[in-house]
Amino acid sequence: MSDIFVYPCAGRIAGVDEVGRGPLVGAVVTAAVILDPARPIAGLADSKKLSEKRRNALYDEIVEKALCWSLGRAEAEEIDRLNILQATMVAMQRAVAGLARQPDFVLIDGNRCPALPMAAQAVVKGDSRVAEISAASILAKVTRDREMAALDRQYPEYGFARHKGYPTALHLERLAALGATEHHRRSFGPVKRVLGL
């Protein structure tokens, strides 16, 4: 972990992260994780810096060893209704609320905290500085990537398994040629243009 983080004086600490703010399709997925100090997990890092194979192995280890963990989400329809930032905050609240044990303190990746019933702190680059946030980023990314692989089987012509819904040249070309699916975010510029909204 680079740029050493000084932990707050608190008993049970949860880390929270999100994946999927930028894609044009699908949910934004969040995770909250409370690690078990008695069962350390080696190699936790920002999910984006890990190979898919390593992420999947760590996902299984986190699920097995964490004191508790929970996923939250906001679907495309909710993102369109609220906006991506507000939908992400709601999804983070859902992840924290879903934890089997209530944390005393929550550390959130980024520079904003959702309203929570316990103390919380935003940590810039938290996914590479705080083990709990790294674990949350891995759970959220593996979950969302698997959802994109499932969507790819449903709509193979869009290439979702390759670009994960992000606005790559391939995705934009397929979107223009084929139109939007029911899973696309209608409030996002490229989708709006295709739909003539």
Curated annotation (Swiss-Prot):
Homology family: Belongs to the RNase HII family.
Protein name: Ribonuclease HII
Gene Ontology CC annotations of this record: cytoplasm; ribonuclease H2 complex
EC code: 3.1.26.4
Major site of localization recorded for this protein: cytoplasm
Functional note: Endonuclease that specifically degrades the RNA of RNA-DNA hybrids.
Organism from which the protein derives: Edwardsiella ictaluri (strain 93-146)
HAMAP family in the cross-refs: RNase_HII_B
Keywords: Cytoplasm, Endonuclease, Hydrolase, Manganese, Metal-binding, Nuclease
A UniProt-annotated Pfam family: RNase_HII
